[in-house]
């Protein structure tokens, strides 16, 4: 077996593990969302992730945390945390698979914002991916009487803001290593979300506290596995594995809440995943750091 094939298999393993961890995080957040409000969930998820992430960064010392791009880190954090608020609110309203699929459809919107904000050329493949993806999202939303479920639309907003965060990461990709981006994102999100969390703070049970600690742990290690996976294998080659999170989310929803999806929605899921894979492969020559947006 060639070195390239070994790297591809190892990269796929890291990514599948990462998305299993992140889908498990989603399940824990859904447990907490039955009692806790979204501002608290967003803050606790970031705070506990930061507590876990800091020791790892200082022990490994993979890169300096000093940066000259603080403004861009703030923009990336502002767009990323907006996506997070939308996603975590949605996760308490929709079945887990729906919330995850809609929020992780960001690659579909990326070519549009790359064209508008970075003046990147949009090729035919990327254009088709956007159109196919939007069709899939409409099928998943399943409009009733001409009106979309507002909760599902918030999930789409999560994907849109996540794609904007990817754009800001791309603008930093020449100077900022992935570990530094992850550090500033987690730090700034913890600080930004602390204020609304303080305003809306409420008592929580031991179960919810443990769920949030677990979510922070899974988020931190999920991000680290993502970074590792994309560092050893070409993003365009391993792009299909990112949608394993939808399968894991569907499994958790079925096991824990007996959530099921019908045939029509299942077809929409497949269409969105295919569109996301096409969009990712169409941009596979971009820097690997573009791919590591994690809500």
Name every feature range the model reports, one short phrase each.
Residues 10-18, 57, 62-86, 150-160, ...:
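Loop-to-transmembrane-helix transition segments
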Residues 27-30, 38, 53, 144-204, ...:
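Transmembrane alpha-helical segments that form core, pore/gating elements
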Residues 87, 106-128, 247-266:
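C-terminal transmembrane-helix exit sites in multi-pass transporters
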Residues 125-141, 162, 264-283:
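Hydrophobic transmembrane alpha-helices of multi-pass small-molecule transport proteins
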Residues 2, 247-295:
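C-terminal-most transmembrane helix of multi-pass membrane proteins
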Residues 2-5, 50-69, 135-147, 189-208, ...:
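Membrane-interface helix-cap regions at the ends of transmembrane helices
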Residues 10, 35-82, 161-164, 184-199:
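Transmembrane alpha-helices of multi-pass small-molecule transport proteins
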Residues 100-105, 172, 176-188, 223-254:
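Helix-helix packing/entry segments at the starts of transmembrane helices
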